[in-house]
Structure formats: C-alpha cells, structure tokens
C-alpha cells in the first residue's frame, strides 16, 4: 500500500463524516489499521497542499478544506506523490518511448494511461465516498 492510497482512504473517511466536525487522526488510523505516525505525516502533507485543515485543541482534528465535490482523485495523488513527469515514462523502463519510437507496449499502454488520467480528474471525492458507503452496505448485508 502506498502513501497516496492511504491518503485517498483518509480523504474518503473525512468525506463520509460531518464536514464541520474535525476528526482525530488517531481515529482514522485505527479505522484503517494504519500506523498513526505514518498517517500523521500523510495528513500533514494534505494540510500543506490545502486539501484538509488541521484544527488544534481538545476537540481538534482534521477536516476537508473544501467541498468534496471540488476534490478529485488526482488532487490527492499529486499532493502526495507530486505531479507526473512532463516527459511520459515508458511502462517497460526504456529511455526513449514515443509515438515515433515506441516500446513494445506503447500502443497498448497509451490509451490506458489516458483513460486513467481522465478517471482521476473526473471522479469527485463525494461520489467516491458515496460509492464506498454503498459497497460497504452490500458487503455487510
């Protein structure tokens, strides 16, 4: 599991809870069985990237910094992993992989990569959270 996966899970958790009530990071860590200090570092990055707000004090915690309809998967992934490189990386690791000089998988990988980017920039957090809730209900009967 990578850091951006955990960030997405934590953001879904925040989208599922009351937006005006801060949630303790320990609670999210316990819910997903993530080491607290590891999640705290991830959340610190999300605060710096202005995706969540940290509230200090006895009733403090973290909450979404903006409407979950305006947060997309790519916002979360890029906040944690950084922006994708300007020059596309080859799926098989070759130095040169372009339409003019393709690797053996270039033609198959290019549409998948495009579709993945499209999905990540069009799937808002609120829809993702609703779908996760539905799936949990189906799984739990």
Model-derived features with residue positions:
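Short amphipathic alpha-helical interface segments
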Residues: 10-19
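A short alpha-helical element within helix-turn-helix/winged-helix DNA-binding domains
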Residues: 26-32
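Alpha-helical residues within the helix-turn-helix
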Residues: 30, 47-48
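Short, hydrophobic-biased segments on the C-terminal half of alpha helices
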Residues: 43-44
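Beta-hairpin "wing" of winged helix-turn-helix
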Residues: 50-64
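C-terminal regulatory/oligomerization modules of transcriptional regulators
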Residues: 72, 86, 91-141
